[in-house]
Swiss-Prot record:
Disulfide bonds join 344-456. Residues 61-165 form the THUMP domain. Pfam families: Rhodanese, ThiI, ThiI_fer, THUMP. Belongs to the ThiI family. SMART domains: THUMP (SM00981). Residues 404-482 form the Rhodanese domain. This is tRNA sulfurtransferase. GO terms for cellular component: cytosol. It is found in: Cytoplasm. The active site is at residue 456. Its main location: cytoplasm. It is an enzyme of class 2 (transferase). It comes from Vibrio campbellii (strain ATCC BAA-1116).
Length: 482
């Protein structure tokens, strides 16, 4: 197994020292993730590309998944590497591997060369292409928009034939930019805005203002853990949970109805700014888009920004909702967001779309700011890697079993894609497939006289979902870990 990783082109327009630093960070990021999930896979930095190799194909799918979801990579090439003697030997090897692919089709050969050879890249393309054209009678050379492009790379005495090319995330390697604190609610917008900053190279820490109790927090932790695990697991990041119910209660009791929405957002920014200052983070990230809701007009956003000196980044400010949802679907957060409750919208019945500074300040004079200071002081900070462990500690009553008891039903809560790749079948046991993101709405329709064992590959999502269901009053759930 061998992959050639091509860094994002923006890295190579940097100065020599910056380019070296960025590619070194990318190399370390890849190595850290690969080491944590596989065995006997080596990572090498080759100046303008990174090689990931192994003597076996055991972890092929896992490594490809890692590389195509790691920021800073333009594309990933799967290659077959062999030694060669001369130009004709290269042609024969290419014919053996690719001859059948060009039958009845147009083709072109694209070659790259590094090292000292007695032929140029153009001569290599002409020799191999001409040979293939003669050897495969039904094939025809076409240099512009061919049906098949055969990519060949020669490095010193090694021939790399490209078997497949996979698109990477692009962006910058994680850790090349400064850390940010994302205000995450679990909805479409905050998940996408967090992803965009991960992709751009920032370590994204997550700040959650809890308005909906334990069930809401569990859902947001799932989204945050998913984003970190899928796109940023080379970084150590924090999840901060702030119990904002006392602040909401104070607003509901003392603040004029029309000003509630903007003042709540101002309280969010004040609290997040305090937390960012403690963590020595220079910027906050939100999923706000211009005009999407009443608090997101230009006037209101300006009033919201003015309560903190911390920079507020809004990567989605000019995005349409449809585009946000489409990207959420692409990155895998849509299903979380669809089942996530929305609490902020119920705060104000007649929200102002053009707040006045004097009115806001007058209403905030009624507010007891010691409550805000206290909830920030009581904020819980968790290493995001410990979310799985925390779910065990938070719900010790969630029983974990290795064998299926009589009459119990196993619920496979993996995504449809995971279930299709490796379906769960147990002799003599009924197995139902309900994706985790539909469990909250469909579990109540099941026969509650039965016991249900939740199953996922690693046991993390099953524990979190079991905790969620128990918070909803269902006590007939356990975690299945065969």
């Amino acid at each position: 197994m061998k992959f050639i990783v091509k860094p994002h082109p923006e890295i190579f327009v940097k100065s020599e020292s910056v380019r070296k630093r960025f590619t070194k960070i990318l190399e370390c990021n890849i190595r850290n993730i690969v080491k944590s999930r596989t065995e006997s896979v080596a990572v090498f930095n080759r100046r303008d590309h990174i090689e990931v190799t192994s003597e076996s194909d055991e972890f092929h799918a896992e490594v490809l998944e890692i590389l195509t979801h790691t920021p800073g990579i333009r594309h990933v090439l799967e290659v077959k590497q062999t030694e060669f003697k001369d130009l004709h030997d290269i042609y024969e090897q290419v014919l053996e591997l690719s001859g059948s692919l060009i039958e009845g089709k147009t083709f072109a050969v694209r070659a790259k060369r590094r090292g000292k050879h007695d032929f140029t890249s153009i001569e290599l393309e002409r020799y191999v292409g001409g040979g293939l054209n003669q050897a495969v009678e039904s094939a025809r050379v076409k240099l512009s928009k061919p049906d098949v492009t055969i990519n060949v790379e020669v490095t010193n005495d090694r021939l790399n034939q490209v078997l497949a090319s996979h698109k990477g995330l692009g962006g910058f390697p994680l850790g090349t930019q400064e850390d940010v604190l994302s205000l995450i609610s679990g909805g479409f917008d905050s998940g996408v805005s967090s992803y965009l900053h991960i992709k751009r190279g920032s370590k994204v820490h997550y700040c959650f203002f809890n308005l909906g109790g334990p069930a809401h927090e569990i859902g947001v932790k799932q989204v945050s853990h998913y984003l970190w695990n899928k796109y940023g697991s080379s970084a150590k990041v924090r999840f901060i949970s702030v119990d904002f119910e006392p602040v909401v209660a104070e607003i509901l009791e003392k603040v004029d109805d029309g000003q509630m929405g903007v003042i709540l957002k101002r309280m969010f920014m004040r609290a997040a700014g305090m937390i960012a200052q403690k963590m020595k983070i220079e910027a906050l990230v939100t999923g706000e888009a211009l005009g999407q809701v009443s608090s997101q007009t230009l006037t209101n956003l300006r009033h919201i920004d003015n309560v903190t000196d911390t920079l507020i980044l809004r990567p989605l400010i000019n995005w349409d909702k449809e585009d946000i949802v489409n990207l959420a679907r692409e990155i895998g957060t849509e299903d979380f967001a669809k089942t996530m409750p929305e609490y902020c919208g119920v705060i104000s019945k007649k929200p102002t779309v053009k707040a006045v500074k004097g009115k806001l300040e007058a209403e905030e004079q009624k507010f007891d700011f010691s409550i805000l200071e206290q909830v920030v002081q009581d904020a819980r900070m968790t290493d995001i890697r410990d979310i799985a462990k925390e779910s065990k500690q938070a719900a010790p009553e969630v029983e974990q079993v290795q064998a299926v008891e009589e009459h119990a039903i196993v619920l496979d809560i993996r995504s449809p894609e995971e279930e299709d790749d490796n379906s769960l079948e147990i002799d003599g046991v009924e197995v139902k497939h309900i994706p985790f993101y539909k469990l909250g709405t469909q579990f109540g329709d099941l026969d509650q006289a039965k016991t249900y064992l939740l199953y996922c590959d690693r046991g993390v999502m099953s524990r979190l979902q079991a905790l969620y269901l128990q918070e909803q009053g269902f006590n007939n759930v356990k975690v299945y870990r065969p």
